[in-house]
Amino acid sequence: MKNILTTCLFLCLLLTVHAADNPNVKKLFTVTSGELKLTFMVGTDNRLYQLGFGDAAREVEPPAKMPSREWEFLPPYGNGVLTEPAIQATHVDGNTSTELHYTGHRTETLAPGIEQTVILLKDPAYPFTVDIYIKCYTDNSMMEIWNTVTHNEKGKVILHRFASAAPVVKAKEYWLSQFSGNYKREATLNEERLSEGVKILDSKLGIRAHQMRIPSFILSLNGPAKENEGEVLAASLRWSSSFQFAFDVDWNKNLRLLTGMNPLGSQYNLERGGTFTTPAILYTYSKQGKGEASRRFHRWAMANAIRDAEKDRPVLLNNWEATHCDFDEDRLKQLFDGARQVGAELFLLDDGWFGNGPYSRDDDKHGLGDWDPSTKKLPKGLSYIAKEALKRKVGFGIWLEPEMVNPQSELYQKHPDWIITQPKREPILGRHQEILDLTRPEVQAFEWDIIDKTLRPNPDITYVKWDCNRYITQPGSSYLQPADQSHLWIDYNWALYRLMDRFAKGFPNVMAMLCAGGSGRVDYGAMPYFHSFWPSDNTDPLGRIKIQWGFSHFFPANTISAHVTRMGKRHLKMAIDVALSGAFGIDLALDKATAEERAQIADAVKL
């Protein structure tokens, strides 16, 4: 510890000397997290420049001349900035340019190994401020960066762009690894060398936003990424909605990394005195290749971003592949018996347990939104069937999709104005369903009531699978004002986090899996409220192993739900081996399995 303090003091003194010797420098300071360091310079023009981002051991000296504007840490639109802007606003008087000057910074220790620096910026001509937050988790060389925008102008300021961070990297070459794909082939790793210009990775889906691309990437410096050697930066955005990553290689071969919410269709009208907060972007740095960067993400997540990270995940049996929506109490009891025989610890009752009369959930066209248990399938109710599982020493969990509704439902007939849609347009369905407008307070109350009335009277339900089976195609709200329609993408997601937080705090003993038609919602914005996630509906082990490997770059194995199924008609041993690399589960009709197959599964459960 004494050596670390001595080194930090030496670097601070060294920077002070350099600042005193350079007529262009007003202040130099660093923010360091283990091996990762950000070096800042405040110029005599009062702008905040970034001199380095990367290896903490690398000394960065201020330039002999005033840096050009492309080195501004959070470049605002207009007034001489020619690169991709991080912040763009229209002020109340119509001025579309913003100037940001440094007014100070402070650093505080939040907990052992966690420090936070806040850098204060202000427009010299307007009461418009941006505060940059940099939280350092020093044990894992991790930085978490976000910012807040506030103003006191006499009216609304329109925010057009609002990046979470925009650091600049300097290297000879940049190799980008992204994790893209589509339904049943999610998180497929693709690596390419970046050339001069702007490369965009994004999602425009709103919810189930990560079906085609997860909000994470790896940047290898000076060559393709290797497992155990070479410099890499790994990053992940804590946001479950539309996002955008812009990789801007300029004429001097510098790379700016603009990351955050997708600004498309999302301009935000910020009221006087209001605060706009961006999601956080996580960065870690490694000189030992992407393997060490991945392990740092895992260690950080286990300590900071996963619910009950050290708690054992139950081996569960899911009924979906065995029954779909066609089951009754006797069939479920047969499945409970199968779960007990192989040693499964929990039975998860999937879709199909709710809806009555003409809206009975007998297929995916009916009943979504009507969350009363089916009197046809479960005449004795949820409490009875949960206790039947417990009699067999098997826990009981349930499937919920609180954000969705079928047009063929009682809820839709009563509240057609509750859905996300656009006026004068034919509704576009996804999986025969619509999305409830979570910006609307009545919907927020309704969705909480779904969770509360399902779980509170039924304390034997100890697990929830929270699903979300479509994305937004017609962004519009009958609740939001016409001028604020573009708020939908952002306000929906913040409301969703509030609901998830209420669920996690209200039912601390109920474990939860995050699902969205596969991996449509996998990020560290949502994971603090969940124990695991469903990475894909592709459970063919040959395809699944690639998907799980992709997610493992950022997420620990105990968060990646992995089930044994018949998909692909592979050898059962292969399906078991692949599933054992994650949070193990079973999705089979065990009563139709052979004795040898049940024995194989039972042996796997014991592991």
Give the predicted meaning of each segment:
Residues 95-100, 268-287:
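Short Pro-Gly-centered flexible turn/kink motifs
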